[in-house]
Amino acid sequence: MKTLIILKDLTKVFDNQLILRGINLEIKQNEFVTLLGPSGCGKTTILRILGGFENPSSGEVLFQEKSILNVAAHKRPINTVFQKYALFPHLNVFENVAFGLRLKDFNSKIKANLSLNKTHYQTNKANLSKTFHQELTKDLTQEKTTQITHNFNNQIETLTKDFETKQTALKCKKINKKEQEEQIQKEVLKYLKIMGLQGLEKRTIEQLSGGQQQRVAIARALINKPQVLLLDEPLSNLDLKLKQEMQYELKEIQKNSGITFLFVTHDQEEAFTMSDKVVVMNHGEIQQIGSPEDIYNEPANRFVAQFVGESNLIKGVMKDDFLVHFDNQTFNCVDKGFRKEENVDIVIRPEDIDIVSQGKGLITGIVQSIIFKGVHWEIDVKTAQRTYTIHTTDHVELNKQVDITFNPEDIHVMEIW
């Protein structure tokens, strides 16, 4: 996929506080990218800079290799769906969705071509006239002068006829107000159908549920066919079931429309469910960029491991390639490239730990708590060094002494940042 957007060394300062710290990010065409992080990490600020609602303190924003920092928000090929949707309460569903189209000049391309055709005509005419007058300055016979003048007049006549023919053809392509209204009607109904809102055209915004309002906001943003759609936590006000339904719908819309989506959230489930690429942020810095699978299975540091999914985080020491020491034992692992005796952070996911009979595992402990989570049990096992959180489908008795075990590939070793 071709790179569409490049953010280069972006910084942003608010009230002497550094909000963004040298952000570098590439976003490709038709990609679903999510900025994931806690409140105040700078993700919405990036969205606002890209949308043209804020300027960076330093750095560059390139769109198709050209800077757009001096391009007004309404002139960028980018639309935004805000957290509060920003719908017009005095307009019904149809008019909310049609709003952007009513501001659009449907004949703008034709007008541009008319102007371009006129410019070409004037330039070519001026060049012919210049050549003609240069010829006349030469020492010519009367017959030669007459011939040159005749040729010049024929060329001008042909050029003018071609120009007028093209202008007439272009003007015929212009659409009148009636045709424009018919096109708006067709486009609005098309997007209402895509968003599952057919039949609700005449309803007021107050008569819609939260999910329906969100669909209206997305339809209004999509109808102008932007190259990029920015979404600022649009699912945060929805109930769990509706949120899950909208996650699927948004991904389908993005895939079918070919529009690049940049989504902002603090919810890892939203990020993982929809995204091609996840950008994890904290304190105005990018912590890790990768696919949902990479972010979860190979977190770059302690923050990412803690923020994304539940984790058992442990401090340890690398003894050698494929050998790490923690909890008074040395374990086999699959990591290498660290210095010997280097202090490291270790993450073991709860679902990667198994509870086995005493004497058959790696570490011994006592079952301290059991919580039923619906699809699994969350069990805390207290060992001599720490408490491990484990997710299992097997029920275990409280206060029972057990062993826990895990495989070398379940131990993920990270540098300490």
Swiss-Prot record:
Function according to Swiss-Prot or TrEMBL: Part of the ABC transporter complex PotABCD involved in spermidine/putrescine import. Responsible for energy coupling to the transport system.
ABC transporter domain span: 5-308
Compartments where located: Cell membrane
Recorded topology in the membrane: Peripheral membrane protein
InterPro entries registered for this protein in UniProt: AAA+_ATPase, ABC_SmlMolc_Importer, ABC_transporter-like_ATP-bd, ABC_transporter-like_CS, Mo/tungstate-bd_C_term_dom, NA-bd_OB-fold, P-loop_NTPase, Transp-assoc_OB_typ2
Subunit structure: The complex is composed of two ATP-binding proteins (PotA), two transmembrane proteins (PotB and PotC) and a solute-binding protein (PotD).
Positions in coiled-coil regions: none
Catalytic reactions of this protein: ATP + H2O + polyamine-[polyamine-binding protein]Side 1 = ADP + phosphate + polyamineSide 2 + [polyamine-binding protein]Side 1
The species this protein was found in: Onion yellows phytoplasma (strain OY-M)
Family: Belongs to the ABC transporter superfamily. Spermidine/putrescine importer (TC 3.A.1.11.1) family.
Binding positions for ATP per the UniProt entry: G37, P38, S39, G40, C41, G42, K43, T44
Keywords linked to the UniProt accession: ATP-binding, Cell membrane, Membrane, Nucleotide-binding, Translocase, Transport
Enzyme class at the top of the EC tree: translocase
Keyword ATP-binding in annotation: yes
EC number: 7.6.2.11
Any GO CC annotation of this UniProt entry: ATP-binding cassette (ABC) transporter complex
Upper taxonomic lineage: Bacteria, Bacillati, Mycoplasmatota, Mollicutes, Acholeplasmatales
GO MF annotation: an example: ATP hydrolysis activity
SMART domains (UniProt xref): AAA (SM00382)
PANTHER family documented for this protein: SPERMIDINE/PUTRESCINE IMPORT ATP-BINDING PROTEIN POTA, SPERMIDINE_PUTRESCINE IMPORT ATP-BINDING PROTEIN POTA
Principal location listed in the UniProt entry: membrane
Name of the molecule in the record: Spermidine/putrescine import ATP-binding protein PotA
Stretch list, region Insert: 105-177
